[in-house]
Amino acid sequence: MATADKMEAGRQANRLRSALSDAVMRIAAKVGKAQGRLRPADIARKAVGDFVTKVDLRSEQQLRRELTKLQPQAGFLGEETEVAGLDNDWLWVVDPIDGTSNFARGLPHFAVSAALLFRGQPVLAAIHCAPEDALYTAVHGMGAWRNRRRIEAPRGRFDDGAILGCQWFRGQQDMRFLTQLQSKGARIRTLGSTVVQLADVVRGRLDGNVQQQGRLWDFAAAGLVAVEAGLRFTNWHGQPVFP
């Protein structure tokens, strides 16, 4: 009976992964078409160096409607709109456009990201990375996929040829840390999207990604993809971000 229950749970997870994938791809298609039609009036500043567009807002609203239908008992946390049900066991965490500044300037490095958490642990994820027009998905304990094919991350290199993605580094202390990395031969890349950079680590285009800070919607989905692809995803003390 336990085996049958496990098989049924796996089938349900794959059905939900497929539905989430379809929702993210629909949003990604609309976001891609909208990029070339942005006007200055469509872009607003939230804070220094932080922007939001009308496309962000529309995309998050549509994702909220679709994901709520998939898992009605789940709360919702998005970057751009009000939150709901944060105390629920289940929680959708969404970033409609990770890399909005790139998107607003016509640059290709942005992504659509959505994850379903159960009691704080990501269990389902889907991200669409615009630079490669690729869909990444993951299910906790079942693996990761790229364009619906299983993917395992290659082993990164950490010698003097390592190429590392970096995000959210500011201030003198952060700059000293980056200088230390570079003194050991690492080459630094900042693409402006945590999701895109983590996907590049999964693909082996980057050997790792480090960042000083981030919000849950920045890494919930991409972090699960990375872990299910065989990578370590830790805090500064080497502890798993999601135990």
Regions found by a protein language model. Give the residues of each.
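N-terminal subdomain of lithium-sensitive/metallo-dependent phosphomonoesterases centered on the IMPase/IPPase/PAP
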Residues: 1-97
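A structural micro-motif at secondary-structure boundaries
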Residues: 146-153
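DPxDG-like acidic metal-binding loop motif
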Residues: 86-145
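Residue-level signal for inorganic ion chemistry
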Residues: 27, 31-35, 56, 67, ...
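Short secondary-structure junctions
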Residues: 39-44, 144, 184-191
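An extended, acidic
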Residues: 154-243
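Generic detector of well-ordered alpha-helical packing
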Residues: 57, 80, 96-99, 130, ...
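Short, Asp-centered acidic motifs that coordinate Mg2+ and/or phosphate
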Residues: 75, 124, 207-208
